[in-house]
């Protein structure tokens, strides 16, 4: 290499490493010595002693002399590599950066132009290989990732390029699976055009609002840099970014027109990178080969529209678990351009993850992390592509994506990534730059509503309003929380009387009401910096959310849990049969927003199995399978899913019941939490905690005792009390509600907790004492068996056993037994009569005297 190029190489090396901590090893300044040559491929590695060798940890940068041309080429050598068996100098892995890479970056002409709207060839995606004046390439010379991952082979290996999946798109069907109903066309009356002028007011209540895009405005370029520093940076037109993460994991999807770069990194799991580009674009990995021989990243063969690359820890090891995952997720982008398809499968995978955890089959479900995150990322990519190809976006599409991200990400981060419950986060700005406008609008709409008038509207209107609040409001709105509380209270009144039909609308209304009231765990702060108004709102939010948690717990009766479990069994049967279209909201239940943790216990599982329709036994593969799984595991799965609080993206029980953590005493495993009075809760456990006023129930299976504790905020003392058996006074003659604020609990001698009914008004109180005429099934003693019992928990900490329910036992005597008893009684009377007659007759006639005289 000539002296100018040598100076440039030195300048580039010095410039790049000057931004990082370095140390140098002084060497002799004598002329270059080439007495010791190390041959690497067709090049020679030598020490150039004319300048210091700059080192950064294990990374060494030096020049390479080409044997044929006697010219130097700038390169990076990674020393002391543990995972390579190649016998290179110092055990190093070496790749070249050719001197042509020092030229200024060059791009195709389309980068300076705008794509034609609706043209599939519109995306302009380029792979750049320039170093000079290109700050984006700095990580390639500084990264330590190359020390850890095998992503830079010199030649193709087996499985580097693999066959396309059978589920992906074909030339005859380039867009893949499309779900029903078809995508709605723009409505002229509800269309907002992006023409560069101030946008008109966006109606976020109308789900059919259309946002027409002017792609001429989307000219911002995105430069994608591989986290492995293994693929040269790729440029595309920016479309958005989707972020998902927690305290242990982060996934970022960089979206461009016709492009996606997904990066998944985790403390507990290996990383994975997926790149999607147009099928005529060739991404290039960084290795020592010249450009004409430079490899593409691993992945399947190109499809009719896209080409997919996947880099992971398992690229070199075909038997590796990550190798299987890489091949699976590589098919996702080409299976469908319908974002609903990917959201549906993300929901199904989430359900399968929860079911697997609940069944006890496996405690490690980390492989779901890659599958679910990849599905969600591809869903946002598919939506961005459909918007690009059609030039419009339905507001409903943006809301759907946002809702599913908020619903699924906390679950996958908690169970698959091992993150803490409160640490998850997610965001996406795909083709939607009016979130602030939408948020301001929904706040105004909610502030102006009249709650009494709103409650008179049909349920589908409630769903639209609460759905918008859930999607766009990042903080709880006072009116929305009050409205949600009133709405859930009305649903509770119908649910405890078994008069509610849990169709999809009712399930979604309950979910969005709970989510809109709870917010994103930013509401319950109470510190000295809060103003009076903020303090008042915080207290109201806490009080109403405690009430909602209590009402959902009360709605989760034993009978409802069984019916909800059957619904889940039906869904899992469809999952096994290969069903596609699904949302977790279809199986949402009050139990999933409650404070009941006992539904996975054996008694509740057996109750569920006893009512499963026979048709499901075949679908669920009953009988002993190869792995020993029976229908019983599906029962555990269903009830375990009911125990997941999917309505919250944080630990709602901990946040809404701070009294449970106000002392250092750790509670035993909790079955139920009942937040009654302010800063006071009942906690039901199997073992007595060392805190609170504690009651132990008599007449319960000693293997599964029931312990009730009344815990007050800040009171860390422990005391024991006895449950008294009483007959309740009839409160019908009083206008006041004597038992309001109390909780009625029905339980079995086996230790199973059946129902927990909250007495919130006079009507429920009257039903409590109505006996057999009660319209609330749990209050009807005629439905009780001798093994059932009931008690009442008052808000002041008093617990009483209800004698009227304990002593009521109705026995049905068979008629044959009754008539046989009557016949036996008559026969006994007849025999007794004969005996008495004989005795009396003998005495009167002096027969006994004659008998004695005869002797």
UniProtKB/Swiss-Prot annotation:
GO terms for biological process: fusion of virus membrane with host plasma membrane; symbiont entry into host cell. Residues 247-310 are annotated as: Interaction with gL. Residues 174-195 are annotated as: Disordered. Residues 20-815 are virion surface. Its main location: virion. One of its GO terms (cellular component) is viral envelope. The chain crosses the membrane at residues 816-836. This is Envelope glycoprotein H. It comes from Equine herpesvirus 4 (strain 1942) (EHV-4). The gene is gH.
């Amino acid at each position: 290499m000539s002296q100018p190029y040598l100076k440039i190489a030195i300048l580039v090396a010095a410039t790049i490493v000057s931004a990082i901590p370095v140390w140098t090893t002084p060497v002799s300044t004598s002329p270059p010595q080439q007495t010791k040559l190390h041959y690497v491929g067709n090049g020679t590695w030598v020490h150039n002693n004319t300048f210091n060798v700059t080192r950064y940890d294990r990374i060494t940068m030096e020049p390479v002399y080409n044997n044929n041309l006697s010219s130097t080429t700038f390169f990076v050598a990674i020393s002391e590599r543990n995972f390579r068996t190649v016998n290179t100098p110092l055990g190093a892995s070496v790749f070249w950066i050719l001197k042509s890479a020092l030229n200024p970056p060059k791009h195709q002409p389309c980068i300076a132009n705008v794509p034609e709207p609706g043209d599939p060839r519109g995306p302009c995606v380029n792979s750049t290989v320039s170093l000079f004046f290109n700050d984006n390439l700095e990580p390639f010379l500084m990264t330590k990732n190359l020390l850890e991952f095998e992503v830079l082979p010199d030649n193709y290996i087996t499985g580097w390029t693999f066959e396309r999946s059978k589920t992906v798109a074909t030339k005859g069907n380039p867009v893949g699976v499309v779900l029903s109903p078809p995508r709605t066309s723009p409505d002229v009356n509800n269309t907002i055009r992006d023409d560069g002028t101030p946008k008109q007011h966006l109606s976020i209540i109308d789900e059919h609002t259309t946002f027409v895009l002017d792609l001429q405005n989307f000219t911002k370029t995105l430069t994608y840099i591989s986290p492995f520093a293994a693929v040269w940076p790729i440029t595309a037109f920016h479309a958005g970014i989707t972020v998902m993460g927690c305290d242990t994991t982060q996934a970022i999807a960089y979206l461009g027109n016709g492009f996606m770069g997904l990066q998944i990194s985790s403390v507990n799991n290996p990383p994975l990178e997926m790149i999607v580009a147009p099928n005529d674009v060739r991404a290039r990995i960084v290795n020592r080969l010249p450009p004409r021989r430079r490899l593409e990243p691993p992945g399947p063969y190109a499809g009719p529209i896209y080409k997919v690359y996947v880099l992971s820890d398992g690229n070199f090891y075909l038997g590796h678990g990550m190798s299987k995952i890489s091949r699976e997720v590589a098919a996702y982008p080409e299976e469908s351009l319908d974002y609903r398809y990917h959201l549906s499968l993300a929901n199904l995978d989430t359900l399968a993850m929860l079911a697997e955890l609940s069944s006890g089959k496996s405690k490690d479900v980390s492989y779901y992390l890659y599958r679910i995150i990849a599905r969600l990322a591809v869903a946002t990519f598919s939506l961005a592509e459909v918007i690009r190809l059609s030039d419009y976006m339905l507001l409903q599409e943006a809301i759907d994506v946002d809702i599913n991200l908020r619903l699924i990400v906390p679950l996958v981060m908690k169970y698959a990534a091992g993150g803490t419950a409160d640490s998850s986060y997610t965001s996406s700005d795909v083709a939607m730059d009016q979130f602030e406008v939408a948020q301001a609008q929904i706040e105004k709409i909610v502030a102006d509503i009249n709650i009494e008038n709103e409650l008179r509207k049909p349920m589908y209107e409630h769903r639209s309003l609460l759905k918008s609040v859930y999607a766009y409001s990042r903080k709880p709105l006072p009116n929305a929380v009050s409205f949600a509380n009133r709405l859930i209270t009305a649903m509770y009144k119908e649910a405890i009387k078994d008069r509610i039909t849990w169709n999809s609308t009712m399930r979604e209304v309950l979910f969005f009401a709970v989510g809109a009231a709870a917010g994103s765990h930013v509401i319950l702060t109470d510190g000295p910096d809060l103003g009076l108004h903020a303090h008042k709102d915080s207290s109201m939010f806490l009080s109403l959310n405690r009430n909602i948690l209590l009402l959902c717990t009360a709605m989760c009766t034993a009978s409802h849990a069984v019916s909800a479990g059957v619904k889940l069994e039906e869904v899992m049967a469809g999952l096994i049969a290969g069903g596609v279209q699904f949302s977790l909201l279809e199986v949402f239940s009050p139990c999933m927003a409650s404070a009941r943790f006992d539904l996975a216990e054996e008694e509740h599982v057996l109750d569920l199995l006893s009512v499963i329709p026979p048709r499901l036994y075949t679908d669920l593969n009953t009988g002993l399978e190869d792995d020993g799984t029976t229908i019983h595991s599906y029962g555990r799965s269903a009830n375990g899913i009911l125990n997941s609080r999917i309505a919250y993206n944080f630990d709602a029980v901990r946040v809404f019941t701070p009294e449970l953590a106000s002392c250092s005493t750790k509670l035993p495993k909790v079955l139920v939490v009942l937040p009654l009075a302010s800063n006071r809760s009942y906690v039901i456990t199997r073992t007595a905690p060392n805190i609170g006023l504690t009651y132990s129930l008599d007449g319960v299976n000693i293997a599964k005792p029931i312990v009730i504790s009344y815990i007050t905020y800040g009171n860390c003392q422990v005391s024991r009390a006895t449950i008294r058996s009483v007959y309740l006074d009839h409160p019908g003659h009083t206008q006041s509600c004597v038992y309001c604020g109390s909780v009625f609990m029905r339980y079995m001698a086996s230790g199973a907790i059946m129902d927990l009914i909250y007495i919130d008004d006079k009507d429920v109180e009257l039903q409590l004492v109505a006996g057999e005429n009660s319209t609330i099934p749990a209050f009807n003693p005629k439905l009780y068996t001798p093994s059932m019992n009931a008690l009442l928990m008052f808000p002041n900490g008093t617990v009483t056993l209800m004698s009227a329910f304990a002593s009521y036992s109705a026995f049905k005597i068979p008629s044959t037994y009754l008539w046989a008893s009557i016949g036996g009684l008559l026969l006994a009377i007849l025999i007794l009569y004969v005996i008495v007659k004989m005795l009396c007759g003998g005495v009167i006639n002096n027969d006994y005297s004659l008998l004695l005289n005869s002797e």
